[in-house]
Each structure stands twice: as C-alpha cells, then as structure tokens.
Amino acid sequence: NQHLAYDDLDLDLKSELSEKKAIHSNIGVLMLSGGDLKDAKRVEHPIFREHPETGKKALYVTEAFVKEIKDLDPKESQKKLEFLYSHASQEKYIYRHKWSKGDLIVWDNRSVQHFAEHGYGDNERTMHRLTTSGSKPY
C-alpha cells in the first residue's frame, strides 16, 4: 500500500521530494524479454502522486523502472532511491495472497507495487490480465 508508505515518510523528506520527478525507463523489461533496446523510453513522473479519485498521495517509485531522481547529484539520487525502495517494501505495506481455486484479484496500480511470488505450487493456473486506461501520474 503505497499510500501508507507515503503517509509514514518523514515530513522533511516529503517536503524535500515533493516537487521532484523520477526518471522511469522500460529498458530493464526490454532486456529481460529480448526486446529491441531501440524501443527504450525514458519518462518523468512525480515521486509522490495523487490518486485522481481519492486525492490521497502515494509513493510512486519502483526499483524495476526508476533510474534516477531528476536534478539530484547521482550519488544523492541513488541514496534517496535506495531508502525509498527499502521503505516501500516493508512488510507492513505488503499483502500476500494465499491462492485458492477460483480466486480473483483486482488492484489499483496507482496505489500499489505488485510482484508475483508464485504461491500456487505445482497447481495449474489460468491468468487473464485486463488493463484499463487511466490517468497519467501527474
């Protein structure tokens, strides 16, 4: 729950990073999937984003895509990102699902980071992904 992760951040850090942008890139995904690296893109998104329906702020950095914090010294950027990644992945912000036959999970990508832990053992699994359009994280 990245809303709670944001809420628990120190006020000074929130203030320091409130207007900062993170540079996101899909190059890691392309490398893993054998995609054409010419298709790599870099985009800027705020480190803290506001949910368009609830107005709640959330931490919006993920180790898989964020490469740096714009306008920060590279070492300082890396130090801050490592802290934010560690903070965001604390157990208290994690939901682990125990799979049962017929389960359906829906989540809001604007508020979470998700990661498959393969908790279904040797059981057959059928997965359907539905992606709806949404707002940019600004």
Model-derived features with residue positions:
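Non-heme Fe(II) oxygenase catalytic core, chiefly the N-lobe of the double-stranded beta-helix
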Residues: N1-L104, N109-Y138
